[in-house]
A protein has these predicted regions:
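Aromatic-Pro/Gly-enriched surface loop or interdomain linker
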Residues: 1-18, 168
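Hydrophobic residues in well-ordered beta-strands that form the structural core
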Residues: 3, 49-50, 144
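Alpha-helical scaffolding within the catalytic cores
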Residues: 4-9, 35, 126-132
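Solvent-exposed loop/turn segments at secondary-structure junctions
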Residues: 7-9, 26-29, 53-57, 122-124, ...
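Short alpha-beta junction capping motif
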Residues: 14-60, 139
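Catalytic beta-strand/loop cores that center a nucleophilic Ser/Cys/Thr
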Residues: 16, 69, 74-139
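Extracellular ligand-binding/catalytic regions of CAZymes and related secreted enzymes
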Residues: 124-126, 136-169
Length: 169
C-alpha cells in the first residue's frame, strides 16, 4: 500500500498498483491525470471511491461517468439504518443491517449501471438512497461507499468490513 496527495501519480505511476482509493474532495485533476486514472481502470485496475470521492473533481466528466455518481448534497449529520440490498454479494455476505451516525449522501446516479449493495432511508426527505454500489468499467472494477464523514463511522466494525471487502473486490 502507498499513500499520496500528489495527483500527478495518476498520470505517470499507476502501473505498480492493483487498485486506487480516493477519499478526497480537494482540487481538480488535469486532463492528463484524469486520462491516466481512466486508462488504469479501463485496463483492469480497481477504483474505490469513499465518501467525498463523489464530490471530487467537479469538472472531470469522465471521472464521474466512471464512478457513476456525483455528489448532490447530503442530510444533516444524523442516525440512520444502512440496509443490505444484496446479502449474497461477497462484499455484503453475512452483513446485517446496521445503524450509523453520518451524513446520508444524495447522488446523481444511474441505478441501471451499477449493482446496489447497501441503501439507507432518509426520513427527512422520505427517500431511499444508495450507500454502496459496484460495477465494471472496461476491464476494471469500480466500488463506491458513501459513508465515512468522521471517526465515529470510521470506527464502526460494519463500516470497516465493507471497506475491507470493497477494497479486495
Amino acid at each position: 500500500a502507498s499513500f499520496s496527495r500528489d495527483y500527478e501519480v495518476l498520470a505517470t505511476g499507476l502501473s505498480l498498483f492493483e487498485a486506487v482509493l480516493f477519499y478526497t474532495d480537494v482540487g481538480e485533476l488535469t486532463k492528463t491525470q484524469e486520462r491516466g486514472l481512466l486508462s488504469f481502470v479501463d485496463s483492469g485496475g480497481g477504483f474505490f471511491g469513499l465518501h467525498t470521492a463523489a464530490a471530487s473533481f467537479r469538472e472531470c466528466e469522465g471521472y464521474h461517468r466512471m464512478l457513476n455518481g456525483f455528489f448532490n448534497g447530503h442530510s444533516p449529520h444524523m442516525k440512520f439504518t444502512v440496509t443490505v440490498s444484496d446479502p449474497g454479494d461477497p462484499i455484503t455476505e453475512g452483513l446485517a443491517d446496521f445503524e450509523v451516525t453520518d451524513e446520508l449522501y444524495y447522488l446523481k446516479h444511474d441505478p441501471g449501471k451499477s449493482h446496489h449493495l447497501l441503501q439507507a432511508y432518509d426520513e427527512t426527505r422520505d427517500e431511499t438512497h444508495v450507500m454502496a454500489f459496484k460495477h465494471t468499467c472496461g476491464e476494471g472494477r469500480v466500488f463506491f461507499f458513501a459513508l465515512g464523514h468522521d471517526m465515529a463511522v470510521l470506527e464502526n466494525p460494519n463500516f470497516q468490513q465493507v471497506v475491507l471487502r470493497g477494497a479486495l473486490w
